[in-house]
């Protein structure tokens, strides 16, 4: 029986994706190899009572991967090994979890590719605000501003500003935002949000 965070077992043969970091190592020194089986440190726990304890690797579908660009600089296709089950979680953001994955077909993310992912995305409104901020932090300024133009208005700008501030605070706490270009890109977005608020 599946726990409260899991909706169903998913089809292993569907197309899945994961954003990975290749320019620098993760904080734990890990690097993800390509075209070989990678095993999660913690197995999927179907009875987890806390989302952070679900285990496995989080992966997503193409229409939701825009939400996860903050995770790295490269988009990979994900194959699920024959002996591994994959589970769809109870989430509005298309999150799937598996114990083992194979990362293939890496593609570097830049502003143009981020824009493509945005145009093919189907996210809840609040997730667009998070993704917009993530794009700004990653230096995908054109994409961030396009999301802002398309998704932010006088009625929801306060929510967008709160999401940006909360997102950036978490990143600052994690010592993530230390790049002058990222700081400038976030400022451009923040100033635009304040302009919308003053309309």
Predicted regions and their residues:
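ADP-ribose/NAD+-binding catalytic cleft of ART/PARP-like enzymes
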Residues: 1-54, 67-73, 80, 84, ...
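Conserved positions within tetratricopeptide repeat
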Residues: 145-146, 161, 187
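Extended amphipathic alpha-helical coiled-coil/heptad-repeat regions
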Residues: 164, 177-197
């Amino acid at each position: 029986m599946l726990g409260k965070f899991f909706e169903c077992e998913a089809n292993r043969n569907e197309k899945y994706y994961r954003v990975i970091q290749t320019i620098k190592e993760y904080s734990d020194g890990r690097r993800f190899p390509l075209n070989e089986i990678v095993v999660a440190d913690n197995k999927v726990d179907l009875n987890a009572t806390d989302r952070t304890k679900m285990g496995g690797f989080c992966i997503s579908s193409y229409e939701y991967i825009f939400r996860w660009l903050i995770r790295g600089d490269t988009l990979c296709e994900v194959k699920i090994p024959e002996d591994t089950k994959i589970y769809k979680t109870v989430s509005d953001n298309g999150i799937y979890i598996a114990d083992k994955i194979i990362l293939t077909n890496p593609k570097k993310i830049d502003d143009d590719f981020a824009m493509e992912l945005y145009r093919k995305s189907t996210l809840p409104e609040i997730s667009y605000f998070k993704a917009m901020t993530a794009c700004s932090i990653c230096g995908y300024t054109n994409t961030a501003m396009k999301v802002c133009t398309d998704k932010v208005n006088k009625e929801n700008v306060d929510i967008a500003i709160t999401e940006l501030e909360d997102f950036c605070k978490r990143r600052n706490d994690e010592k993530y935002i230390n790049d002058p270009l990222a700081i400038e890109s976030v400022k451009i977005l923040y100033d635009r949000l304040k302009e919308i608020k003053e309309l």
